[in-house]
């Protein structure tokens, strides 16, 4: 989706900082590295940062990585992962996005004159006392706001598994131990 928005060669030789090295951040980092990006990982968990290094990525503190980043992508699902001070540290014209995510993963509520734009893939974000950034999908999750989201077949499967789990819990209410369930006994 981001490649569609920013262009076919959006990641070629770009310095991309990915904040969060959970499953979403890992998948995105691998994908954009394959598309030619130089990827730096920022994660407050030292084990996740070490995993990123073992996976061949640079790992830095967010304050060190942001000034050099052509693009910053938050993949944490944590409110205010990218603060107003972080935005001020970015360079003019850098792109800023969220993948997955929640409302205000980028602290846009601290940018006084920011107004979300309907049906806009990108918008110029004038950071108070800072640079103008290219904000993708109004700071909402790119994959579900400007992209097609998850395929319906995947959503059907996900909801079916969730419904099966709820049915199992209801059927066995009061009789379940507080242990892990063997997959074979559920099927």
Give the positions of each predicted feature.
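Rossmann-like adenosine-cofactor binding region
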Residues: 49, 55-131
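Glycine-rich adenosine-cofactor-binding loop
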Residues: 2, 7-33, 40
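Residues in the short beta-alpha loop(s) of Rossmann-like NAD(P)-binding domains
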Residues: 22, 44-45, 102
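NAD(P)-binding Rossmann-fold cofactor-contacting core
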Residues: 33-55
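Secondary-structure transition/capping motifs at alpha-helix termini
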Residues: 8-9, 36-39, 60, 90-93
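Adenosine-phosphate binding glycine-rich loop
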Residues: 1-8, 108-187
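Short, solvent-exposed amphipathic alpha-helical segments in soluble enzyme
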Residues: 31-35, 88-91, 112-114, 150-153
